[in-house]
Curated annotation (Swiss-Prot):
The SMP-LTD domain is a barrel-like domain that can bind various types of glycerophospholipids in its interior and mediate their transfer between two adjacent bilayers. Residues 115-327 form the SMP-LTD domain. Residues 42-423 are cytoplasmic. Residues 1-20 are lumenal. This is Maintenance of mitochondrial morphology protein 1. Residues 332-372, 387-423 are annotated as: Disordered. GO terms for biological process: aminophospholipid transport; mitochondrial genome maintenance; mitochondrial outer membrane translocase complex assembly; mitochondrion-endoplasmic reticulum membrane tethering; protein insertion into mitochondrial outer membrane. It holds the Pfam family MMM1. It comes from the Eukaryota. Its main location: endoplasmic reticulum. GO terms for molecular function: lipid binding; lipid transfer activity. Residues 355-372 have a biased composition (Basic and acidic residues). It is found in: Endoplasmic reticulum membrane.
Length: 423
């Protein structure tokens, strides 16, 4: 005789399952709330703390690069390369090679005792250049078109819709350069101090360093849409508007000339970069959503600011630098401008006469092209057997006399200025 198994209490089991379900849902809600509060809406660190952390990171990266260069030099000693001696002209004199010490001696510049110089004249030139650039941008959409093409280039991810520029402000102030000094560096850009001696400066180059400070409000505002394409395309669309403003930039600009090599045909270049002690303060505003909008999300601002600093560091912060190829500075006729057929004391009137002569020359060139075109048509007709006695439509006596004047027969040029005789 078997004893039946006891029937479990259904009420107790169902109650425990409900409690577990509620507890799991509550834990998920708590985790989501904590994530939103502390990760998205959490207070960002102060700008001073963030700038100090970034400066420390950049400084450690620069020191690591210098240590790697020193280690490489000590492990693999350099051998002086002896280039092939090319045959030199006997006409050109062979002066002594200009080393760094020779240049400093001939210019009476002592890098150890010379005081830093102000750059007031340079600030004026830079201000005029920037002012002209801003004035051109007000009357031309070239900068707006270029920005739109760059933002919507091939690197735009698939989850972003078309990016539209909604605001562009180029600022009102100008950068101030000051405290310029010249220091000798080696071919890798490392500073040659006094311990390097005169021998260490023979094969190096000179580098100019100047402080830069800009306090302005340069703004670029864009708007786009985040496209959620999973599990199927365009499941959700989230409008996003961003405005990034450069509030202040301060740092040290380093400029040096890298001489070219006549052996391999490399040109002379201008190399510039910023030292790792710079500071870039940004103001980032954001607006997410269409109806219930989230304004100025701190985490979005932190991500964009970190991305912009990384972009700047990877391009023009030491040890990385930018190189610009310099054109030839030898005076050439094709580069000559101004002073054509003008008297010494002429001013606006002379310039106006020069411009009128340019217009007259353009009109003559245009008329010459039309005459050549009609001559080609007449030659083609003669080859086809068409009678040349029949004048063309719109012509009366031939190519030379296109229209008859009222008083006398003279050569009238199409498009010429009234009263201009071309006899």
């Amino acid at each position: 005789m078997t004893i039946p198994a006891p029937i479990p209490d259904k009420a107790e089991s169902s109650l425990s399952f409900t409690q577990g379900l509620l507890l799991g849902q509550l834990s998920i809600v708590i985790l989501i709330g904590a994530f939103i509060k502390f990760f998205i809406f959490g207070d960002p660190p102060s700008p001073d703390v963030t700038a100090a952390l970034r400066a420390t990171e950049r400084r450690s990266r620069t020191l690591a690069h210098k240590r790697s260069l020193l280690t490489l030099r000590s492990s693999t000693p350099r051998r002086a390369s002896q280039p092939l001696n090319r045959k030199r002209s006997s006409v050109l004199r062979n002066p002594a090679p200009l080393t760094t010490n020779a240049i400093l001696s001939k210019t009476y510049y002592n890098v150890d005792s010379h005081q830093p110089e102000s750059l007031d004249w340079f600030n004026v030139l830079i201000a005029q250049t920037i002012a002209q650039f801003r004035a051109d941008a007000q009357h031309d959409d070239a900068i707006l078109t270029s920005l739109t093409k760059v933002l919507n280039g091939g690197n735009r991810p698939d989850f972003l819709d078309e990016i539209k520029v909604t605001e562009l402000s180029l600022g009102e102030d100008f950068p101030i350069f000051s405290n310029c000094r010249v220091i000798p560096v080696d071919e890798d850009g490392m500073t040659l101090g006094r311990e390097g001696g005169a021998a260490g400066r023979e094969h190096g180059r000179l580098q100019a360093r100047m402080d830069v400070d800009l306090s302005d409000f340069i703004t670029l505002a864009v708007e786009t849409k985040l496209l959620l394409n999973y599990p199927k395309p365009l499941v959700a669309v989230l409008p996003v508007a961003l405005a990034v403003s450069v509030v202040r930039f301060s740092g040290t600009l380093s400029i040096s000339f890298v001489p070219g090599s006549p052996l391999n045909g490399s040109p002379t270049t201008l190399a510039f970069c910023f030292l790792d002690d710079y500071r870039l303060d940004l103001s980032i505003r954001s607006l997410v959503g269409s109806r219930s909008r989230l304004q100025d999300v701190p985490k979005i601002a932190q991500l964009i600011e970190a991305r912009l600093h990384t972009w700047f560091d990877e391009r023009c912060v030491e040890p990385r630098f930018q190189q610009i190829e310099l054109p030839s500075l030898w005076p050439r006729k094709k580069n000559t401008r101004g002073g054509e057929d003008l008297d010494t004391g002429s001013d606006a009137g002379g310039i106006g006469r020069a411009r009128s002569r340019d217009v007259e020359r353009d009109l003559r060139e245009e008329a010459r092209k039309e005459v050549e075109a009609e001559t080609g048509i007449r030659v083609g007709r003669s080859k086809l057997g068409v009678s040349l006695d029949v004048p063309d439509e719109g012509s009366e006596d031939g190519l030379r006399f296109r229209r008859k004047s009222k008083g006398r027969d003279e050569y009238a040029m199409p498009g010429s200025m009234p009263g201009l005789s071309m006899t």
